[in-house]
Design a protein with these regions (language model features):
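Structured adenosyl-cofactor binding patch, chiefly the S-adenosyl-L-methionine
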Residues: 120, 124-171
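S-adenosyl-L-methionine/SAH cofactor-binding core of RNA-modifying enzymes
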Residues: 63-116
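Hydrophobic/aromatic beta-strand patches that form the interior of the parallel beta-sheet core
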Residues: 4-6, 34-36, 85-87, 110-111, ...
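Active-site beta-strand termini and strand-to-loop segments that position acidic
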Residues: 270-273
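Internal, active-site/partner-interface "lid" segment
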Residues: 145, 157-196
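Pre-active-site segment of Zn-dependent metallo-hydrolases
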Residues: 275-314
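SAM-dependent methyltransferases
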Residues: 1, 186-248
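N-terminal nucleotide/polyanion-binding subdomain common to many enzyme families
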Residues: 1-78, 204-220, 224-225
Length: 314
């Protein structure tokens, strides 16, 4: 997988990403990271890439021309058959989540555009950007730190990047639950003991403890995630009433890959966050609606809704 970071500060980006896991992944050729200096594409003889905004206002604005040319220089090198996205990191974007990281990890190449000053001319954003993503409701000096966060989170999901492939499946934010508390040697530290169950060697009891602690921690620290988890479990209980018919959706929930899009009127709609496939279950056949009339938290369904009886093109 290739990451192209379009920035005014390429050294900052490369210094941050060429260490630890992402740095090793580049050395092992699991991923490729390219920092493109937008300033190299300006037509201004003084090397300027910014100007005053029309209509007044504080600060300077990055101009459209150097941003567009930098982006095009990268896009021209990407084969047409490669899956690619152009991401503008901005507080105005959708929140970056682990689900979004999984979605982006399915791409072949990602271009991350970093703004600076007061932002970038809106016209070039309208022309090249496919995704607007925010890492939080606060303001940074530029988009570089946000871009590095996204690269790190997505890179971890690329096969072979993590030494232990199970790490990405068990750490915080896989599924709807936070990770359970963890302990290492010594058994006792500052008078605090490691929970006895972890020393018991009984894997069944250990797994049950981990699940219980994950639920408790999520409820305490992230009530928003806990509410989503409870809702998914309610769906699972309904689906279990016709287990053979809905086994695919049940497994999706069990594996932490299910995103609940709709639950009501006897209908359940789930999204497989890894493969972007949609699963529909009608748990009350007497109330089967027209799926196209639903108001969903997605712009469109890119593949199809997988109905239990047939594939329904969307």
């Amino acid at each position: 997988m290739k990451f192209h970071v379009l920035t005014l500060f390429p050294d900052m980006v490369m210094q941050g990403l060429m260490t630890s896991i992402t740095g090793r992944a580049v050395q092992q050729k699991k991923i490729d990271i390219d920092a493109v200096n937008i300033r190299d594409y300006t037509q201004d003889k003084h090397g300027r890439v910014d100007d005053y905004p029309y209509g007044g206002g504080a600060g300077m604005l990055m101009q459209a021309q150097p941003v567009y040319d930098a982006c095009q220089s990268v896009m021209e090198k990407i084969p047409q058959n490669k899956k690619k996205r152009v991401i503008y990191v901005t507080p105005q974007g959708i929140p970056f989540t682990q689900a979004k990281a999984r979605e982006l990890a399915a791409q072949d190449e990602l271009l991350l555009l970093c703004g600076h000053y007061e932002g970038i001319d809106e016209r070039v954003l309208e022309e090249v950007v496919t995704d607007y993503i925010s890492i939080g409701d606060y303001v940074l000096t530029g988009g570089e730190l946000a871009a590095m966060v996204i690269v790190d989170a997505v890179a971890r999901l690329v096969p072979g990047v993590l030494g232990n492939e199970q790490s990405a499946l068990t750490e915080s934010f896989h599924g709807e639950l936070l990770e359970h508390p963890q302990y290492s040697r010594p058994d006792v530290w500052h008078g605090k003991k490691v929970p006895e169950v972890l020393l018991s060697g009984n894997q069944k009891h250990i797994d049950a403890w981990k699940k219980e602690q994950s639920i408790l921690r999520t409820k305490e620290r992230r009530p928003d995630l806990y509410a989503r988890y409870v809702r998914l479990q309610e769906c699972r209980q309904l689906l279990m009433k016709q287990k053979l018919l809905h086994i695919d959706m049940i497994e999706l929930i069990n594996r932490g890959r299910a995103q609940l899009l709709y639950f009501g009127q006897g209908q359940i709609l789930l999204k497989d966050m890894e493969y972007e496939i949609y699963f529909h279950a009608c748990v009350d056949p007497s109330r089967l609606p027209d799926i196209r009339t639903w108001t969903l938290p997605v712009e469109k369904i890119p593949l199809a809704v997988l109905h239990q009886e047939e594939m329904i093109p969307y």
